[in-house]
Amino acid sequence: MLLHIPAIFTAEEVSRIRAALEQAEWADGKATAGYQSAKAKHNLQLPQDHPLAREIGEAMLQRLWNHPLFMSAALPLKVFPPLFNCYTGGGSFDFHIDNAVRDIHGGRERVRTDLSSTLFFSDPEDYDGGELVIQDTYGLQQVKLPAGDLVLYPGTSLHKVNPVTRGARYASFFWTQSLVREDSQRTLLFEMDQSIQRLTRDVPDHPSLIRLTGTYHNLLRRWSEL
């Protein structure tokens, strides 16, 4: 499942965040890449322990934890702290698949990368190129969203970032370990939950809603891992 979640941050908030990112000291993005990915990665990245990365990352997660669409789709158990990158001057990241497991907190905890997310902090007209290209069951999907919007997609996806030939593309990316590791099961639960929400709005007293809601929770109980 590939899902576009709009307006995590307002235009005013994005403007302040981008201004702060533009003033930050960036490092070579290869520092956080795996052995194979490092050969394909050509971008800049904020150090993981940078105060600005922690500040914006905490604000992002607070928003997402209160966002019904993200919670319904991701069913998050744990999240790898958001990272921040900048593509400019031809920067790119060739096709790769993200590492299956990431260490956090100095290796004391691990996150399985069931889902990948990218939150854009540059508007499409601010740069040329820079499309996030994701290969899914329907072929190659090119993603270039308005600033403040997020795309959520399976961590198993082959993906790349096209070269940025003008301007700069600022974004955050992170991984989520879901309660439900299998993408097809998460997709089924998401579609059920969205249908239940629409039925609750349109026909709130329909007797089948109780049974349908119960079926959703029984499936979640069967498939979830804690």
Curated annotation (Swiss-Prot):
Xref: PANTHER family: PKHD-TYPE HYDROXYLASE YBIX
Binding-site residues, 2-oxoglutarate: R169
Cofactor: Fe(2+); L-ascorbate
Positions with a binding annotation for Fe cation: H96, D98, H159
Lineage top rank: taxon: Bacteria
SUPFAM superfamilies in alphabetical order: Clavaminate synthase-like (SSF51197)
Cysteine pairings via disulfide bonds: none
GO molecular function: 2-oxoglutarate-dependent dioxygenase activity; iron ion binding; L-ascorbic acid binding
Pfam families: 2OG-FeII_Oxy_3, PKHD_C
Listed GO biological process terms: DNA damage response; intracellular iron ion homeostasis
Annotated EC: 1.14.11.-
Protein name: PKHD-type hydroxylase PLES_48951
Keywords for this protein: Dioxygenase, Iron, Metal-binding, Oxidoreductase, Vitamin C
This protein's record includes keyword Hydrolase: no
Organism for this UniProt entry: Pseudomonas aeruginosa (strain LESB58)
All residue ranges annotated as the Fe2OG dioxygenase domain in the record: 78-178
Details of cofactor binding: Binds 1 Fe(2+) ion per subunit.
HAMAP family: Hydroxyl_YbiX
EC class of the enzyme, as a word: oxidoreductase
